[in-house]
Design a protein with these regions (language model features):
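Extracytosolic and intramembrane catalytic regions of membrane-associated proteins
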Residues: 118-218
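Internal/C-terminal transmembrane anchor helices
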Residues: 71-97
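Membrane-embedded alpha-helical segments of integral membrane proteins
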Residues: 15-64
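Cytosolic juxtamembrane helix at the C-terminal end of the final transmembrane segment
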Residues: 59-68, 99-107
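Alpha-helical transmembrane signal-anchor/signal-peptide segments
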Residues: 96-120
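Negatively charged, low-complexity tracts enriched in Asp/Glu with abundant Ser/Thr
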Residues: 4-14, 139-140
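Membrane-interface helix-boundary motifs at transmembrane edges
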Residues: 7-12, 63-76
């Protein structure tokens, strides 16, 4: 009897450890996907994680059925967490975790982005790629300021001496739109964004004076 209790305790501990490892690995994936993965890699990593979680979910369901006469709390917890992580990942391409991380990203990197904006406005930072398409490649350090490569897009209105600076949140993939944190002191551009906010407020909103969160489809 004592041996049986010891075995059950060991199994419970192993199950708890597996749950913690699964959650930790998923969190690493979520943050890596948001901050670091190139946009052309994201759909494949997302698909791989979805398939992995689906396989784990099926395994948990099978085990619950087999152990239904002597079901442990940890088994149900494992099933629930796996199902929850699968839902978070599968639903609208990571929409829920990405929305949470986006809010964290905006607050944590606010001062760093503000510093970059000041450098652009004083012409210390300019487009620096060979294609001369408005892209400025920033040094690759942590935390990432502009996702999917740490590039920013700079547009200068020479007539009005104003600038619009885009920091990527997501570069999108397949037919997905791109999303940005955008600074602009150009009144015409502001009007465009205000119109976008009116049309689709669930995807576009004003963060503060001169700052917007905008979703665009190129």
């Amino acid at each position: 009897m004592q041996q049986t209790n010891t075995n059950d305790k060991t199994k419970d501990e192993q199950m708890t450890k597996k749950i913690l490892i699964l959650v930790a690995v998923w969190l690493i994936f979520a943050f890596t996907d948001y901050f670091y993965l190139p946009y052309f890699v994201q759909p494949f990593s997302w698909l791989l994680v979805c398939i992995t979680l689906l396989v784990l979910l099926v395994r948990q369901i099978v085990k619950v059925i087999k152990e239904r006469k002597n079901l442990k709390t940890n088994r149900l917890l494992n099933l629930s967490i796996t199902l929850f992580l699968f839902f978070l990942t599968f639903y609208n391409f990571n929409k829920i975790p990405n929305s949470i991380i986006e809010k964290i990203d905006w607050n944590i990197s606010y001062n760093k982005r503000l510093k970059i904006v000041k450098e652009v406005l004083t012409n210390r930072l300019k487009p620096n790629t060979e294609m001369n398409n408005g892209i400025c490649r920033l040094p690759f350090d942590f935390p990432i300021i502009s996702n999917g490569g740490n590039d920013i897009w700079i547009y200068g209105n020479k007539t009005e001496s104003t600038k619009t600076i885009k920091f990527w949140i997501s570069r999108g993939f397949f037919d997905s739109p791109q999303t940005y944190f955008i600074f602009t002191n150009d009144n015409e551009v502001k009007k465009q964004y205000e119109e976008q906010i009116k049309r689709k407020p669930e995807y576009n909103w004003k963060l503060e004076e001169n700052w917007y969160r905008i979703m665009e489809r190129d």
